[in-house]
Amino acid sequence: MGMRMMVTVFPLVVLATTVVSLRSNRASDGRRGIVNKLNDLVPKYWTECCGRIGPHCSRCICPGVVCPKRG
């Protein structure tokens, strides 16, 4: 019975992983499109980094990166 369950569960895990991967790729493409539209309005102002969009330099909004202070 254990082997039979493993044979059933494995394809489900592979399918779920594939769906999640495809969704994240599509989301990234959507964000890129939004950034491009915003850059048409205000060039070089909007950036995407780590799944977020904002009016910051892309390195500053990534975790683990210290943003340089403006004087």
From Swiss-Prot:
Taxonomic superkingdom: Eukaryota
Propeptide: 22-44
GO CC terms of this entry: extracellular region
Keywords annotated in UniProt: Amidation, Disulfide bond, Ion channel impairing toxin, Neurotoxin, Secreted, Signal, Toxin
Sequence positions bearing Arginine amide: 70
InterPro entries cross-referenced by the UniProt entry: Conotoxin_a-typ
Residues making up the signal peptide according to the UniProt record: 1-21
Keyword field contains Disulfide bond: yes
PTM section of the record: Contains 3 disulfide bonds. They are not indicated here, since framework IV presents two different connectivities (I-V, II-III, IV-VI and I-III, II-V, IV-VI).
Tissue and organ expression note: Expressed by the venom duct.
Cell compartment(s), UniProt: Secreted
Main localization category: secreted
Single GO MF annotation: toxin activity
Domain characteristics, as noted in the entry: The cysteine framework is IV (CC-C-C-C-C).
Family affiliation: Belongs to the conotoxin A superfamily.
Protein name per Swiss-Prot or TrEMBL: Conotoxin Bu25
Organism, scientific name: Conus bullatus
